[in-house]
């Protein structure tokens, strides 16, 4: 009997969660707040993303054009493209180590290459997302170091590493500002 109740409860939660994800078509406060800051490209992206649930899904692949099974750094190459005939709709790249002013990311990919592939994906009509696994500013170890529970407090205003964290954010912002087409369109 308990097993049956657990199954029913799990099913109810799943249905409630799926219902919460259904598009309502209503504008949220955030939509109207940023309307004046949107570029034409941003509006186009948002409109296209809103259509996705009615048309299918978007498949993504991290570092897709940078390395794959048995290859690394080849131009115009992608495992997804080799299998499916086209690049994935979504690509992602990690900006970890940009805060350390390194030439390459924590995935050993040159930031200049990430920049170029971001522009290429934009030109193909695809979506790019970024992660940033920054090093632990408190311990100096990698992003997965959780040995000190005060790391978040150390980067907040008044924290011992707040200024360092702000400079790291500035490095990410500077990189993001370099993402533009030859015509000057910001990506």
Residue ranges and their predicted role:
Residues 3, 23-24:
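Short, low-complexity interaction segments enriched in Ser/Thr/Pro/Gly
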Residues 10, 51-54, 123, 181:
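Generic surface-pattern signal
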